[in-house]
């Protein structure tokens, strides 16, 4: 076994990822990897991360002033009968060694996944190089992983190719490695024409409904689910939801099968970095505060409203929406409800970037409702922090939400979440009207204007009771959604796999 003496030696964990904070970030995945890898290192694990050396990474490394070491090693792998190569670099970030694969043909672009016109057409080649290159990197640095932890479809080639690709499936270097695959966003699945299987040396007989085929395409996420030792997702509720047709995005049947097979589907709640998100030390906000001294939160609200050009009266609670601008996040429901939200007495601030047509809609809406609405597209991190600290409430009307980090950050800053009851939102928010002792927010269940407005009516009625609202803020700020519990849980499942 890889670690019959697992209790005596450090667990060797190889993370393979397409983004990681502070090097390259598109969404919440980067936050998770940056924090979870460090948490596991703090739990006496030897954690290594492999990441593409994107243009963005090079820029951020210069800003971070971190020392990057070029290794005297190259990785090469055969894809589509061609040899694709990469230079290897190493950088240490806190207690974690990060290995960067440089290949300007695939990674030297301004964007990570897509342009405004759509995803890069060669994403199969790009992330195939990441996946196979990560395995070659492990061999090049002589790091025999006990656990290879893959994240989202961009790393799905690893479990598929280790199981089926000639030479790799018989490679003794990885004989004792176990594969954990985490689904962060099930709506992105890596769907390609059947020819991709020949490109990557995956046997054609796997193109069936029992293998990689789904709706006439080779589905990489499906393959990863089938051929990993353990599949996890980012909250207990979402792990149950994705086994249903409504949330499974076509993969519900295979997820149900995997779940029945030795409980090989588990939901582990993500966390946030409590050092990074801390209103007591945050240099970006107007006035620092804590759960023991919440008075300064109102100073943040007043100054934020002034900066945004909104009415500074406390009579109007400030409701924020901080999110990627996608249909998943329920932005359309918010926009359709804006006139009624303003009638209730709310002011609204929207921060985000994402789908081009939604950005254009927001610009038009901003011109229409300037008096009560402020919108920032592609906001700075400083403004984002000010909004978390200065808003009274956070709205998350998501169609589905695997985990959600915004509500955890909001709670940390005493900003009360008003959320739709789905996925990780149900694992982190307790409805105040249902449980005044433990409640930390407000939940609505139907994806409808009536249901959303009902939750906002309930929230503003508590807001108007200043004593009750202050207690609610204090309760919210005392919640603990740090990585302490989740990191320990991941280490436990690693050890169980290796036992």
Label the model's feature ranges:
Residues 2-499:
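Catalytic cores of nucleotide-sugar-dependent glycosyltransferases that transfer UDP/GDP/TDP-activated
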